[in-house]
Structure formats: C-alpha cells, structure tokens
C-alpha cells in the first residue's frame, strides 16, 4: 500500500494534522459561535411563543373589551340623543298646551274672523249692487270693491295687538 509507505507517511500525517487543526480553528472561531447563537435564538423564540400565546390571549381579551366599550358608548349616545329628543317633544307640547295656548286661540279666532268677513263682504257686495257684481268679470274690479268694505271690529283689535305688541298686565 502506497499510502502507508514510510516516506509518504510523515507528510500525510503532517497534512492531516494541518487540515484538522485549521478545521478545528475555523469551527471553534466561526462555527460554534454561530451554532450557539442559533440555539440561543431558538430558546428565545420558544420562550417568546409561550409569552406570545399569553399576549395573543391578552390581545383577544383587549379586543373584546374594546368592542364592549364601543357598544356601551354607542348605546349611551343613542339613549342620550333619544332622551333629548323626547324632552324636546315634551317641552314643545307643554309650550303649545300652556304658554302658547292664548296665541293659538287668537290665531284661530282671527282665521275665523277673516273667513266670516269674506262671506259678509260677498253678501254685502251682492246686496248693494247685484247687477254690477254678477256681470263684472274683471278680477281687479272685484278686488277693489271687496277691499272698500270695512274690516270687522275683531279684526281691528287683532291688528292693533299686532302693531302695538302684547299688553303687559298690571300688578295690583
């Protein structure tokens, strides 16, 4: 066997030691630190996965809490808005029933007086000059004739109230 020859044996042994030593040095300086870093990183990732699982549970719990809080705030906002609208409707009904009742009554009375005065104007115009009123077809003549008839006393009072403003009650 030529490999185990005395002449080549020494050189082969030297080269074998050189290659093993360089391999050992390279592995010791470069390989082992990289391997140890990888092992440490894996340990850290495994521990973080355990903590991450706990954190993911915390995140799920936070999402549930946020969802409940948002629903509660939306419900509160809806109830406050609906309560405010109910209060406004109640105040309007109260104002119409008590405070504005006189004004509403005066308004209805004035509407009635206006309609009655229109009927009276037509009747008065037809009795005063039936031939002129019935034969005249021009709208302008009818309007001027109706406007010449005087206004009822109730309408005069209403107009006076509007012009002068509401009367203040005297305290006795």
From Swiss-Prot:
E.C. numbers: 7.1.2.2
Any one of the GO BP annotations: ATP biosynthetic process
Disulfide bond residue pairs: none
Matches recorded under InterPro entries: YMF19-like, YMF19-like_N
One Gene Ontology cellular component: proton-transporting ATP synthase complex
Keyword Transmembrane: yes
Primary location group: mitochondrion
Record field: catalytic activity: ATP + H2O + 4 H(+)(in) = ADP + phosphate + 5 H(+)(out)
Protein's UniProt keywords contain Transcription: no
Keyword vocabulary terms for this entry: ATP synthesis, ATP-binding, CF(0), Hydrogen ion transport, Ion transport, Membrane, Mitochondrion, Nucleotide-binding, Translocase, Transmembrane, Transmembrane helix, Transport
Transmembrane segments: 13-29
GO molecular function terms noted in the UniProt entry: ATP binding
Membrane topology label: Single-pass membrane protein
Family stated for the protein in its record: Belongs to the ATPase protein YMF19 family.
Subunit structure: F-type ATPases have 2 components, CF(1) - the catalytic core - and CF(0) - the membrane proton channel. CF(1) has five subunits: alpha(3), beta(3), gamma(1), delta(1), epsilon(1). CF(0) has three main subunits: a, b and c.
Name of the featured protein: Putative ATP synthase protein YMF19
Organism of provenance: Marchantia polymorpha (Common liverwort)
Species classification: Eukaryota, Viridiplantae, Streptophyta, Embryophyta, Marchantiophyta
